[in-house]
């Protein structure tokens, strides 16, 4: 993989890449019936961490085997790792929002 200059790095379109990642993850999550959220609900946050570790291990293996240059598999694994990180963040945010909602609800049953 070639190295970038600082000027080349500054030209990266973060918004476009983030939007594409979000669309990719949303489509895949819907296609799999929200399996990630169901599994995290059942097995806890360790499930999310194990999925990210699995992808990180795959990336390390591809690098070790010298298969990271121009390898779709390497790029796909990076996208999957990002996707699991995004899903984990969304899960955490949803849990925080649910907790906050519980705190602010007024209990009318007396």
Descriptions of predicted regions:
Residues 1-110:
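Intrinsically disordered, low-complexity regulatory regions
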């Amino acid at each position: 993989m070639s190295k970038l200059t600082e000027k080349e790095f500054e030209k990266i379109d973060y918004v476009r890449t983030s939007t594409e990642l979000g669309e990719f993850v949303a489509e895949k999550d819907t296609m799999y019936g929200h399996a990630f959220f169901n599994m995290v609900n059942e097995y806890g946050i360790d499930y999310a961490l194990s999925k990210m570790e699995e992808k990180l291990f795959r990336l390390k293996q591809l690098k070790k085997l010298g298969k990271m240059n121009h390898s779709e598999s390497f790029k796909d694994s990076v996208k999957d790792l990002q996707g699991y990180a995004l899903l984990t963040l969304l899960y955490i945010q949803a849990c925080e929002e649910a907790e906050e909602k519980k705190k602010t609800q007024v209990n009318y049953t007396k």
